[in-house]
């Protein structure tokens, strides 16, 4: 899969986009082509881990082998969430379902992204024998989720900047643990 900036640019691979975050020209990266994902593969009986693989695989392409991607996803989600399958659902009635996204280690919905993002970074860093420093600036739970996800990384240092007196109470409590 190749990506380019919404403001027009050269094409980049998944690894380059992962590490860049935003395009140099200030645009957002978008895929060259949108993959077709079979909706029959996405149903209520699919685990969150399997769903993640179904959706991510076409966007990653051949930059991560299928068995390695499965391992990364399994390690990211299997031991870090209190709910089996990561996400829990509460059916109110036939037409209303509540999706609970607080089952991660910091109780923030951002755990879903961070618990996977850091192992994806690690995959490439280990192959290249490199280390990186991440700088996170936040007043909420992004920092807590990022710090928790980096705990298991041998290749990433994290520096989290919080504004004085503007940190959400829950984020502050999480940092103290």
Identify the meaning behind each predicted range:
Residues 97-152:
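Well-ordered mid-protein domain cores that form the structural environment of catalytic cofactors
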Residues 19, 53, 57, 115-118, ...:
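Predominant activation on well-ordered alpha-helical scaffold segments within soluble catalytic domains
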Residues 156-160:
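A glycine-rich helix N-cap at a beta->alpha junction
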Residues 1-25:
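Charged, compositionally biased N-terminal leader segments and the immediate start
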Residues 161, 165-166:
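Hydrophobic, small-residue-rich alpha-helical packing segments that form membrane-like cores
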Residues 167-174:
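Conserved small/polar residues in nucleotide/adenosyl-binding loops
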């Amino acid at each position: 899969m190749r990506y380019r900036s919404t403001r027009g640019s050269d094409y980049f691979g998944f690894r380059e986009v992962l590490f860049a975050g935003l395009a140099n020209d200030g645009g957002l990266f978008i895929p060259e082509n949108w993959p077709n994902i079979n909706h029959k593969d996405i149903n209520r009986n699919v685990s969150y881990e399997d769903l993640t693989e179904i959706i991510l695989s076409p966007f990653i392409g051949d930059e991560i082998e299928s068995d390695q991607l499965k391992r990364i996803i399994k390690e990211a989600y299997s031991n870090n969430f209190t709910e089996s399958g990561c996400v829990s659902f509460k059916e109110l009635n036939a037409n209303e379902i509540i999706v609970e996204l607080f089952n991660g280690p910091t109780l923030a919905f951002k755990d879903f992204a961070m618990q996977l993002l850091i192992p994806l970074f690690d995959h490439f860093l280990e192959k290249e024998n490199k280390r990186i420093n991440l700088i996170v600036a936040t007043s909420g739970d992004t920092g807590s989720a990022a710090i928790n996800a980096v705990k298991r990384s041998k290749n990433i240092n994290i520096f989290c900047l919080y504004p004085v007196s503007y940190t959400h109470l829950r984020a502050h409590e999480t940092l103290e643990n």
